[in-house]
Amino acid sequence: PPKPQPKPPPKPQPKPPPAPTPSPCPPQPPKPQPKPPPAPTPSPCPPQPPKPQPKPPPAPGPSPKPGPSPSPPKPPPSPAPKPVPPPSPSPKPSPPKPPAPSPKPSPPKPPAPSPPKPQNKTIPAVFFFGDSIFDTGNNNNLDTKLKCNYRPYGMDFPMGVATGRFSNGRVASDYISKYLGVKEIVPAYVDKKLQQNNELQQSDLLTGVSFASGGAGYLPQTSESWKVTTMLDQLTYFQDYKKRMKKLVGKKKTKKIVSKGAAIVVAGSNDLIYTYFGNGAQHLKNDVDSFTTMMADSAASFVLQLYGYGARRIGVIGTPPIGCTPSQRVKKKKICNEDLNYAAQLFNSKLVIILGQLSKTLPNSTIVYGDIYSIFSKMLESPEDYGFEEIKKPCCKIGLTKGGVFCKERTLKNMSNASSYLFWDGLHPSQRAYEISNRKLVKKYIHFI
């Protein structure tokens, strides 16, 4: 008989298909990413979302780096339960670790701006006219007694050269030019070096020169009595200068340099000391009022001619208290000559009025009066405030020749302290007095120019 078919052995089916072994990692939170990964990546744990890291939390243990470390069996309590912060939907290059404002190498400090070299773009050049206060060597080639091209003059000038400046060093024109920001040393127009055709001398010519002549005055007879360059001849040199400039830079640029440059004039002291009170003996023919009016008219005429030659920025410096210079004190027993000082103040007062009238009359002009009288008066009244120890005697030994005003030649004894003297010789300030007075002068009037 047929064997009863044995019951098939129970299928090993009851074994449910091997459920995926429970992942040691907590169930993956639904990722807010737009594309959820369809299947777990080789790593059983989802790649840990990069921590935003704005503030690195004190992660327990080594902060798990997002990367292929396939065995993160450590159940880190932090990363998973933390609901992924909304800001990191698609790992926007997590503000690349907001480059902590730290190692942003602080930008190297720009080199400290070096002081501007003398070359003022607003005032491209300076032109000086007048007497010894501005003369930088124009008298050297003249047949005149009024020369200072010998020692001890210039003993404090660079290289100790006696250039013909009426001082132990620099003079007013040098300091005015320096404080206007143009250049530190102003050449004399007739200096032979300026006649050379090299580039250096030509650039020196472009930034201005001095036409002044020691001993000159507003009145022609003052200059003629000393055989020096008259104010009218200085204007002739100015015309010649313009011709040379046109050859160098052309007509248009020459016109600009002359009109934008500062033309500065100082005269009057020699008219009063020598022509009125001295050998000229004009005080016998004219009273001081009419003589100073004549001087002021001559000054106005000079300014008008300067304007006619293209100058538009014109400064006219008054007369200082010349009655207090060493050579003029002698006659009054070391006391200031008040007659001279009165005449100087009278002339200055007329100069202020006439320059004011010209300033209103001449279109596109800037005409400024420079009050040097009050600046020097303060230095005479309180010398210790400026570091001067001697205001009545000159620093150098005066010779009897040359009007009893100039230093004897080759006398260098006891002159190492020239800066403590207000006056260098019988009439002219020391280099230090020039420096202080002209710094104050420029500071006071620069905004007008």
Swiss-Prot record:
GO biological process: lipid metabolic process
Disordered, as annotated region: 1-123
Lineage top rank: taxon: Eukaryota
Coiled coil: none
UniProt-listed Pfam families: Lipase_GDSL
A GO term for molecular function: lipase activity
Classification via CDD domains: SGNH_plant_lipase_like (cd01837)
Family indicated by similarity: Belongs to the 'GDSL' lipolytic enzyme family.
Protein's UniProt name: Anther-specific proline-rich protein APG
Designated gene of the protein: APG
